[in-house]
Amino acid sequence: MMEHLDIHSNLYDYRVSFIDDFRTTLAQLGGELVYVLDWNVYRLYESAFAGIERQRIFFMDPVEEKKNMYTVLNLISFFQQLGVRKNWKVICFGGGITQDIATMASNLFLRNVDWYFFPTTLLSMCDSCIGGKCGINVGAYKNQIGVFYPPKEIFIDAHFIDTLSPADYLNGWGEILKFSLTSDAAFYEELKAESSYIPCERITYYIHRGLAEKKKIIEADEFESDLRRVLNYGHTFGHALEAYTKHAIAHGTAVIWGIDVANYLAWKEGLIDESLYLDVKALIKRAFLKEEMVIDEPHTVFDLIRTDKKVRGNTLSFAMLDRKSHLIVHPMVLDASLYRKFCDYLETTHDYYRA
């Protein structure tokens, strides 16, 4: 079993515990408990929750259309009707969408109720579970409302990945790839040597490595004032692509494409060598992205990038790699020149996109 990680926060310190069986940990939680459960998790592991009173469970349909303030307020109303008080604990099982809703509601209700998180997707295990950040969508725009409110403890049982679909499994790999590129060279080389699917026993190692890298960044810049912005690597274009496809592609898959776009632009800006761009691209194509993405209206994607929260005036703070494999924040003006580079990217990567 992997060693736990202790995360230092200006709000309070919290721990990531790597566990063998979530059922044992769940049974050991004491006090007054209320549960926020991904419906899919409940259906797959119903027997594990058999001893819980149904009226204490708020079921989540984990789709982007539900990641809004309407769902947050529904959960808060559920807390009120159940009689939840400050000394209760909110127990959350699910991926990033369920996490976002539980974070926001727990933070707002009674000015903070403690919550605990069992991430059940690879994406939430290897990235979103730490850092305390949540994002709530407004209309078609992603993550326009948010707070920083970390769980009191995170319990990672990697056996949950055994029941993930191939698409959901792929979702987490963009974040692992991101951290491998910015860690020591050995991490990236290890990842390159792996097959597309890694068993539970081995994947825990990569989850731990990725979280350890993220821990360094969020402890130095918890509230995203500067350094933490580098964690948006791949997300700027990824979020725009999600919105463009009306969430037909999943977040993690969009981020992997976003990493490829960011690397292409970094090469064109002279920040990295072409060899690094092509090497990462080859890994992405072999292990991650095997389907074609159709972009008929690149100008629409570019316009969606303009709505990114990192835009100031007409300048975007773009997270990119440099030659030392460090993530940096590189300002780029959202003008005709950048749009032309984006279109050039689409034209030169026709095996990924059809523009």
Region locations from a protein language model:
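Solvent-exposed alpha-helices and their adjacent loops that cap or buttress functional pockets
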Residues: H8, G83-R85, L108-F109, N137-V138, ...
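C-terminal charged capping/lid subdomain of soluble metabolic enzymes
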Residues: L5, I176, I272-A355
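A glycine/threonine-rich phosphate-anchoring loop and its flanking beta-alpha core
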Residues: M104-E194
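Active-site segments that bind and position negatively charged phosphate/pyrophosphate groups
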Residues: A193-H299
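Non-catalytic interfacial helical region
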Residues: N74-F93, A102-F117
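Residue-level signal for inorganic ion chemistry
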Residues: I19, Y35, P119, D157, ...
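Short glycine/serine/threonine-rich phosphate/pyrophosphate-binding segments
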Residues: I97-M104, A240
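ATP/NTP phosphate-donor binding region
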Residues: M1-K89
